[in-house]
């Protein structure tokens, strides 16, 4: 399995399985001298951890992170940062029947076909449990980006099933169990999820992410465009089936006179491009959206096969999120932070001495 590392100059490698002893991450390329504690990382992990809502998995994990290396006397040393989280609430017996069957719309079948073997307990490496380490690594990137560059990254639940959250403007409050900035919609979501649980079903969701104060110039054309790397990182999140940058798929219905982000001496007139042009950040807000599929781990019977290829009826038991999108916001924020951090490091390495010859249109007052 060779796809466990993200980034080039700021590299993150994760390891571990859902029901293994622990999850871990190695961060290579973090600049030295930044103050970093386990508490700094724990703040982000607590936003993601399971068991915080009746509409999320009932699995209880403290997700207490340990810093194993790369920090001395409270500051990063520039050496690899090792992070570890122990699993404490595995219930592998819930998955005993999954060993010889394939859950529909899960990675069970494809992992078996690719590797000839799989850890069936909780999905093993394919479980969203692994994203705890992405959030932990993202916390390090977030801290650096905010303290050194003033970059803020914040996401929110913009759709859950038929319920949409519209007209959200910065700053917004996402400090609730749904990461929803609209208090009225929070109650609507709560009622919808209660009914969904009674129906033994699940639902999809959409998450929106905004990154503010991103400097102009991040992105490496042509193959490592900033939007390409953001899409790659966000698509690697479990259950994500679509990524949009800026207006995304809505551009198919737009005309050029509407979509083009005109420029004046006072700055950009609009931001349909989502803060990226030609694969390079413009200095405007970077805006991205992800669509997450409904989990197929539900109590409603569905057709599948066993390892002998025989037809079976499958009911997935265990502790699962009826909407995986509810806890996806901190994960999406982390992935955006990791990409921006990597591209900042790459841009600094090559273009650190470049003085932009034209005014900063995103901040014309400067």
From Swiss-Prot:
Keywords: Amino-acid biosynthesis, Aromatic amino acid biosynthesis, FAD, Flavoprotein, FMN, Lyase, NADP. It catalyses: 5-O-(1-carboxyvinyl)-3-phosphoshikimate = chorismate + phosphate. Pathway: Metabolic intermediate biosynthesis; chorismate biosynthesis; chorismate from D-erythrose 4-phosphate and phosphoenolpyruvate: step 7/7. Pfam families: Chorismate_synt. Belongs to the chorismate synthase family. One of its GO terms (cellular component) is cytosol. The gene is aroC. It comes from the Bacteria. The keyword Ribosomal protein does not apply. This reaction introduces a second double bond into the aromatic ring system. This is Chorismate synthase. FMN binds at residues 125-127, 238-239, 278, 293-297, 319. Transmembrane segments: none annotated. InterPro entries: Chorismate_synth, Chorismate_synth_AroC_sf, Chorismate_synthase_CS. GO terms for biological process: amino acid biosynthetic process; aromatic amino acid family biosynthetic process; chorismate biosynthetic process. Homotetramer. PROSITE patterns: CHORISMATE_SYNTHASE_1 (PS00787), CHORISMATE_SYNTHASE_2 (PS00788). One of its GO terms (molecular function) is chorismate synthase activity. It is an enzyme of class 4 (lyase). Its EC number is 4.2.3.5. The keyword Flavoprotein applies.
């Amino acid at each position: 399995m060779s796809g466990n590392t993200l980034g080039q100059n700021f590299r993150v490698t994760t390891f571990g399985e859902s029901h293994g002893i622990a999850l871990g991450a190695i961060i290579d390329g973090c600049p030295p001298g930044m103050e970093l504690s386990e508490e700094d990382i724990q703040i982000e992990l607590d936003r993601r951890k399971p068991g915080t809502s009746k509409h999320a998995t009932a699995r209880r994990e403290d997700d207490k992170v340990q810093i194993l290396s790369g920090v001395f006397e409270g500051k990063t040393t520039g050496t690899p940062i090792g992070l570890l989280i122990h699993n404490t609430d595995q219930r592998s017996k819930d998955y005993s029947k999954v060993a010889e069957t394939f859950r529909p719309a899960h990675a069970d079948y494809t992992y078996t076909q690719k590797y000839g073997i799989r850890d069936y307990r909780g999905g093993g490496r394919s479980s969203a449990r692994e994203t705890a380490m992405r959030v932990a690594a993202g916390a390090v990137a977030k801290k650096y980006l905010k303290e050194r560059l003033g970059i803020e990254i914040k996401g929110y639940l913009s759709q859950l099933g038929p319920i949409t959250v519209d007209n959200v403007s910065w700053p917004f409050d996402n400090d609730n169990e749904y990461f929803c900035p609209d208090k009225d919609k929070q109650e609507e979501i709560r009622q919808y999820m209660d009914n969904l649980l009674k129906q033994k079903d699940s639902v999809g969701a959409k998450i929106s992410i905004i990154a503010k104060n991103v400097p102009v110039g991040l992105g490496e054309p042509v193959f490592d465009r900033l939007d390409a790397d953001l899409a790659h990182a966000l698509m690697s999140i479990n259950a994500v089936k679509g990524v949009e940058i800026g207006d995304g798929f809505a551009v198919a219905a737009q005309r050029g006179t509407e979509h083009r982000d005109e420029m004046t001496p006072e700055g950009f007139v609009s931001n349909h491009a989502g803060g990226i042009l030609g694969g390079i950040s413009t200095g405007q807000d970077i805006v991205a959206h992800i669509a997450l599929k409904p989990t197929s781990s539900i109590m409603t019977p569905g057709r599948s096969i066993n390892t002998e290829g025989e037809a079976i009826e499958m009911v997935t038991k265990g502790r699962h999120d009826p909407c995986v999108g509810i806890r996806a916001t901190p994960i999406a924020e982390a992935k955006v932070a990791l990409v921006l951090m990597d591209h900042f490091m790459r841009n600094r390495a090559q273009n650190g001495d470049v003085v932009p010859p034209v005014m900063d249109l995103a901040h014309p007052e400067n």
